[in-house]
């Protein structure tokens, strides 16, 4: 069966190469205004090199990796695809269609300009397989500066979570919600791995979310601190938190109902769309006292097994994405942060500059679990912590016991 699939894919690739060697089919799931504007930065760069960009855009939240592999095995694969999951690259390798990029990045001298978390995220089984295009920190705190002033608090001065929680009474006394939280499973899941990095540090985080999780950390002091901290956050959730979308939650902070939100820093797109300015209307900090921050890296892959002409065009795409100026322009359009530490900063807002400052410390960053860990294990953690979040009577011991049981079932 594998031989017949591979034969069909190879034949399709040969036909497409003969028809138009520099027409690249680009597969992605970006469709919002800022996302399309950012894509156009890449498209302009690719077309400046003499190539053609043909779009395959699918809706968000449709299982994009499944659809991608359906195209590949169906004999109509894209040349370039937006995909971070390491499993997809392993599947392509099994079909003989992976395209390692280690040699390209090494020859271009690009890797030295990426934060360590980016290099880790784009590496699959020892090879550079992805082209990083944007960075988001999963656990940034965005706060309304007017609300902070009215409440008499300064989030930028918080040096610990205890200091943050201690100021919340001042915020309540001033008539505001201290912390806006969207009570959906994925939002709680993202908060958990952000807190795992912040309270447990890189070693604990890697043991829990690495490629080979270490069961000894499941019942550790760090895990107990993580769950106890999560309970404190749950107790701060307002009455309307349950099942609230993240962007609706962000709007509560933008409109001055709440002081702050801790979430992925794609929140910034909502602030920008509302005409707000970083450093003037809103501030951004990492989780107070954080020992590390988890980093999401939006990345592209390219397909192997193609003609020299198409392969060269794909590498031109990689060069465009990796260009420092393109990185800055892309980030400015999308509301993200460049993956290169040497990207020009004059077009970046205050929050992107702060993210790059944080990422200068190689020991202070860890990759998003979706880029490293077994998907079943990650999903099982989400199930347990969301049950813990939703049921205030569930104890830390109960949660740990469930996580241990899941480990034995999935990885034991």
Regions found by a protein language model. Give the residues of each.
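Conserved N-terminal structural module of periplasmic/extracytoplasmic solute-binding proteins
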Residues: 8, 19-90, 94-95, 242, ...
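Extracytoplasmic/periplasmic substrate-recognition and gating elements
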Residues: 22, 44, 48-49, 149, ...
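Extracytoplasmic/periplasmic substrate-binding proteins
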Residues: 29, 194-197, 228-310
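Conserved C-terminal helix/tail region of periplasmic/extracytoplasmic solute-binding proteins
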Residues: 45-48, 73, 149, 363-412
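Hinge/lid segment of periplasmic solute-binding proteins
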Residues: 84-139, 191, 279-281, 350
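Extracytoplasmic/periplasmic solute-binding protein
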Residues: 128-133, 165-212, 258
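Glycine-centered hinge/linker elements that transmit conformational signals in sensory
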Residues: 166-168, 210-242
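Long, aromatic- and glycine/proline-rich binding clefts that accommodate carbohydrate-like moieties
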Residues: 282-285, 331-383, 387
